[in-house]
């Protein structure tokens, strides 16, 4: 048969299948914009700012609606009430991990972030327990972060108050904290092995936030055969996994079951002690990759955005430094006990996380069983997008949400004020495993920097652009330079 005829017949079959799937599902699922055959609602969504497009849809269809990403229906939850009801009140039903094809290729259903069912429960339980035992929120992890904060300050001193782009240095610090927890070892900032690891992690986050990846994730079977940056991401992921496997082999040679040094040792001991199919070398490598992905780039991007916002608002930076001077002084390192006596600094860090909205649409969830949600029927396995933007930028909880204002987290007396709407780490059973670690890092790194340096912009604060350059998977700040002036 003529290849052209085969192609036309194939496209016709695909078109009919798409129309049938859309029509069969739309009566039961929440309402939403009318999808085109095959491509769904992709042309109606801005790949550079997905969250903005979802907000527009919510104005038409309410807090629960359906969009088609390609041929696949995805239910979107918009606003605090809908997000909380799903992730917290119905946590078990909404605890599945939704589909991200490019990352599924990397994880193969293993690890912490992109696994499901028993694998996810076992990995999450083990990771939380191990991180707690090594001091998640306790003293030993704090010691490691304080050590890295001192190294960070020394690296910043080496800039000699000259203009610099802080991206690399601010990436090294949280990466080294993860290395300390996982490998029992930190790296010099000029170590070639470390630099290559950093480069691979940085590039993959940029790729994940690109419009091309949003398109790829909707048509993976087709685009696998075409060149593109998805190939670069997979190549980087292979490098990271090979790097981790080499470290695992080194640990196997030196393993002392009575004296575990780090996360890898604990995992290897678990493998020896239990005949558990969830604990294999491959799942160890993926779990460590997940910890790197979650614990390095997210924190470094937040730090980078933090300094940009403090440059934009020098009066805020000055007030934080006054509080540091009053509570900590100049002659000792900041510690976590200081945070309770520094309400303004605590409010500033919370406001930074709220304002930058690092993961606008969260990682996708999926329902683990058929669910009736607000009178709509959502079949088992349906992907769920929870708009964290709609929660963090809620006008009732945070008046003038588009304005950077630490007062969003302060009461009338200047005391720190908690908010249920503060969900930068998501909520419920899939809440970020490394939340405690990230909170400690943000506080200790930022206070250490501001204790030792005045931040100086190269342009007038009013001329600084703080608009995220990409709002896809991660909100990425624009590039900038500054001077670290020793105090």
Swiss-Prot record:
GO terms for biological process: organic acid metabolic process; xenobiotic metabolic process. It is found in: Endoplasmic reticulum membrane; Microsome membrane. Keywords: Endoplasmic reticulum, Heme, Iron, Membrane, Metal-binding, Microsome, Monooxygenase, Oxidoreductase. It catalyses: an organic molecule + reduced [NADPH--hemoprotein reductase] + O2 = an alcohol + oxidized [NADPH--hemoprotein reductase] + H2O + H(+). It is an enzyme of class 1 (oxidoreductase). The keyword Ion transport does not apply. Induction: P450 can be induced to high levels in liver and other tissues by various foreign compounds, including drugs, pesticides, and carcinogens. Cytochromes P450 are a group of heme-thiolate monooxygenases. In liver microsomes, this enzyme is involved in an NADPH-dependent electron transport pathway. It oxidizes a variety of structurally unrelated compounds, including steroids, fatty acids, and xenobiotics. This is Cytochrome P450 2C5. It comes from Oryctolagus cuniculus.
